[in-house]
């Protein structure tokens, strides 16, 4: 084989290899994107199941953090749009950690751990009866949850009486793909969930 023939053969090999890579690379990206989308759906399902199940079993909720560490009520904070404390047989606070994009789970004592990663939005809205228990539910204006009148709950914590009327929570959750390079291929996943407090006095 002459030098010219060798150069031509090398050029053809490079072109063929480039063509193969041009086909294989997008296919690999699609496969990775499909895997990441499946992972995102699983994370979303896990978050949705945990949040809705805990709210449904709750006696009441608080729109702020409660516990031995960084208790919002003790700091005079009685509303956070991205936080809910669920009170039942146990007390658990769920909140969005904005700087790390994580859904956090706090047990009210010393355990404060991430539950779901790559959460880009988490908000809680509340519904309560218009008057007596059993009447139509309406969205609760956050301002009414911090303006009193005030009472004490069973744990002797100060609480707005309107908070005790909450009998349904609307949860808005949005997750993103884990790999930044795949986010153009994998759209964020959104869900809005409604969970009624089955053990609330106002739900009876």
For the regions a language model picked out, list residue spans one by one.
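Short linear sequence signals and composition-biased patches located at protein termini or domain-edge surfaces
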Residues: 113-204
């Amino acid at each position: 084989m002459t030098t010219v023939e060798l150069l031509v053969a090398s050029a053809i090999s490079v072109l063929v290899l480039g063509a193969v890579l041009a086909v294989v690379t997008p296919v690999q990206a699609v496969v990775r994107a499909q895997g990441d989308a499946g992972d995102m759906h699983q994370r979303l399902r896990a978050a949705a199941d945990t949040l809705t199940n805990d709210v449904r079993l709750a006696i009441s909720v608080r729109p702020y953090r409660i516990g031995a560490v960084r208790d919002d009520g003790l700091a005079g904070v009685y509303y956070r749009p991205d936080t809910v404390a669920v009170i039942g047989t146990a007390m658990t606070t769920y909140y969005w950690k904005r700087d790390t994009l994580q859904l956090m789970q706090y047990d009210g004592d010393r355990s404060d751990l991430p539950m779901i990663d790559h959460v880009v939005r988490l908000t809680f809205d509340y519904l309560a009866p218009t008057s007596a228990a059993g009447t139509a539910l309406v969205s609760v204006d956050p301002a009414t949850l911090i303006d009193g009148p005030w009472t004490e709950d069973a744990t002797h914590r100060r609480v707005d009486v309107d908070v005790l009327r909450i009998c349904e929570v609307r949860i808005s959750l949005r997750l993103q793909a884990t790999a930044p390079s795949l986010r153009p291929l994998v759209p964020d996943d959104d869900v809005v969930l409604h969970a009624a407090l089955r053990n609330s006095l106002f739900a009876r």
